[in-house]
């Protein structure tokens, strides 16, 4: 990790909150359970592989395949665009959409959050880590919110395909509103979006899961308020960053907790998206220092993030983020990095394939069918374990290399693909 990014508002804010928050307790690996969404039998879509792209608004785009992008830390917040009431600066948002489209990405998720200083009810609110003062406050007049949403959706109808009212609404760095206020913002956005662009998807605010107190205080109450308004979202969303020392196992525990919270609230079954993720972010507290996750481990964890998502019924993950090295996160995603190579390889393995299911708790085996041919991806949650190779003829690694299978067994840890 070398260069901190001034525009990386999201992770700065999470890091600040993490220093004082309490982490949700981790748990040992568990056998797969029936998820809220069962993706067995479905075709893996390119959109599973979502990405945040630093400087997307200025023409930067990843050198690996990307199926969807989330507009956050792209100078496209409400406060960045509507700089004064009814005065809009669309240049950065136009640029972000144009860059994505020019690179073949038509699936764009925009975060509508970030109250402008002229509209906020709390000028002293955390304001996205102090970069945009007042942006964490609620609108003094919800009619200003209504107008903002209508302006965006009207301008980008058919080009921005999904909207998320807020980012990490359970953290005061991003929102000082109550669950009821956030539910009201969600409902108003939903009604406007559907009236202007019925085909657009409305995604629930991406709730942070790793800080137990803010999650438990906010999210069940938000679901209750949302239910009272008729559940006005098309997709549930979370940010399942684990504590800095956490692994993909702990990330999956947080995802299950989030999923189970919907079940406890009687929330309807809707698609699940993880709209922001990485590992190694400092906190909570001094016993969880930031981590650099490099080499094979970075490749392994990046791939497992998406494979675990499929197992959990999560149909989309937006990695944070593509760009120059960012000191706040543990896994770097840029040209030639192990994580970038791994995601390129994994997409080649599974995009367009039918997901047939996974078995195992510690040694995990998932099967896919693509072009009439079956493949098996196997890895371990921890350590290494033997795997019988009878019937398999080729083994491929996340770095894209393949070789013939020799012998009756192999030892696996990182995900590998076996074919017959």
PLM features: residue spans?
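C-terminal beta-strand-rich structural cap/linker in extracellular carbohydrate-active enzymes
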Residues: 401-420
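Aromatic/acidic polysaccharide-binding cleft in carbohydrate-active enzymes
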Residues: 278-348, 357-362
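Substrate-binding surface in catalytic domains of secreted glycosidases
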Residues: 235, 240-265, 270, 280-305, ...
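Secretory targeting and sorting signals
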Residues: 1-31
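Carbohydrate-binding surface patches
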Residues: 360-392, 398-400
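Substrate-binding cleft and catalytic face of glycoside hydrolase catalytic domains
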Residues: 64-233, 239-243
């Amino acid at each position: 990790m070398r260069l901190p990014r001034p525009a990386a508002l999201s992770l700065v804010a999470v890091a600040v909150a993490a220093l004082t928050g309490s982490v949700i307790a981790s748990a040992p690996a568990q056998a797969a359970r029936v998820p809220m969404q069962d993706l067995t039998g479905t075709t893996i879509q390119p959109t599973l592989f979502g990405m945040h792209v630093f400087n997307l608004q200025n023409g930067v785009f990843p050198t690996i395949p990307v199926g969807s992008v989330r507009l956050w830390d792209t100078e496209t917040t409400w406060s960045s665009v509507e700089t004064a009431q009814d005065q809009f600066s669309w240049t950065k948002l136009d640029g972000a959409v144009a860059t994505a489209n020019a690179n073949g990405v038509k699936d764009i998720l925009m975060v509508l959050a970030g109250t402008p200083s002229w509209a906020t009810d709390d000028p002293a609110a955390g304001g996205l880590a102090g970069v945009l003062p007042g942006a964490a406050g609620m609108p003094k007049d919800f009619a200003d919110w209504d107008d903002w949403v209508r302006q965006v959706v009207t301008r980008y109808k058919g080009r921005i395909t999904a909207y998320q009212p807020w980012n990490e609404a359970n953290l005061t760095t991003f929102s000082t509103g109550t669950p009821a206020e956030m539910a009201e913002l969600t409902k108003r956005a939903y009604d406007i979006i559907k009236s202007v662009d019925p085909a657009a998807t409305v995604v629930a605010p991406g709730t942070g899961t790793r800080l137990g107190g803010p999650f438990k205080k906010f999210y069940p109450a938000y679901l209750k308020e949302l239910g009272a308004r008729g559940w006005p979202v098309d997709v549930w969303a979370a940010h399942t960053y684990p504590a800095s020392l956490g692994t993909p196992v702990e990330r999956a525990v947080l995802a299950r907790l989030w999923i189970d919270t919907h079940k406890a609230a009687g929330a309807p079954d809707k698609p699940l998206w993880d709209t922001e993720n990485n590992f190694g972010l400092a906190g909570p507290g001094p016993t969880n220092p930031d981590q650099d996750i490099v080499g094979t481990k970075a490749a392994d964890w990046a791939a497992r993030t998406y494979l675990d998502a499929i197992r959990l019924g999560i149909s989309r993950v937006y990695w944070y983020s593509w760009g120059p090295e960012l000191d706040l996160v543990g896994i770097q995603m840029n040209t030639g990095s192990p994580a970038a190579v791994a995601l390129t390889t994994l997409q080649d393995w599974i995009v367009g394939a039918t997901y047939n299911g996974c078995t195992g708790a510690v040694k995990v085996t998932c099967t896919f069918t693509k072009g009439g041919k079956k493949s098996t991806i196997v890895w371990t949650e921890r350590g290494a374990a033997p795997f019988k190779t009878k019937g398999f003829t080729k083994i491929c690694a996340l770095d894209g290399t393949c070789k013939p299978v020799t012998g009756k067994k192999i030892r696996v840890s990182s995900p590998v693909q076996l074919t017959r």
